[in-house]
Amino acid sequence: MTLLNNYEYKIPKIWFHEIKGVQDVATLKELEIANQLSRHRANIFLESRAYVRQCLGTLFNLNPLEVPIIANPGEPPELPKGMGYCSFSHCNVAIILVWHENKIGIDIERLDRDFNYAKLAKKYFFKSNSLNTKGESYKNSILNQWCAVEAAIKWDHGKLAEDIKNCLLYTSPSPRDRG
């Protein structure tokens, strides 16, 4: 097994995969967990774990089934001490995975995601009074803020439902907002 002190690259590694129904790499434990989930959630669970195992297997020069990761649903993934940290996120069309020697978090959302961005912004985020709160750029700004907050919570190994109330996101004003 290649541990970090023998690993040449100390920068984060990021992988992006389209969701294609690939579920060919799963441990017995992961199959047991999948059997307890709805069909849709089981498919997402198995495919995301397959990609995570394939990517980390390549990184550490291991058979994907030998990657010693624990990645239970709704919990942060864990690697043994000395193997760094990983975080991953998925939407209905893609999965993104990041690995680094230090704690790290990542989130992905579709730009065309249908959500009540005005309500989300009002509840969780600060905004400039000079911004147009009805446009597509405002919606994208809120989605970017959401990704940043969710990635930070993952970095801290927290739980979104419990920890979002503790997050405050401050953004730099745009040149237009500075006057």
PLM features: what roles do these ranges have?
Residues 1-172, 176:
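Core catalytic alpha/beta fold that binds nucleotide/phospho-ligands
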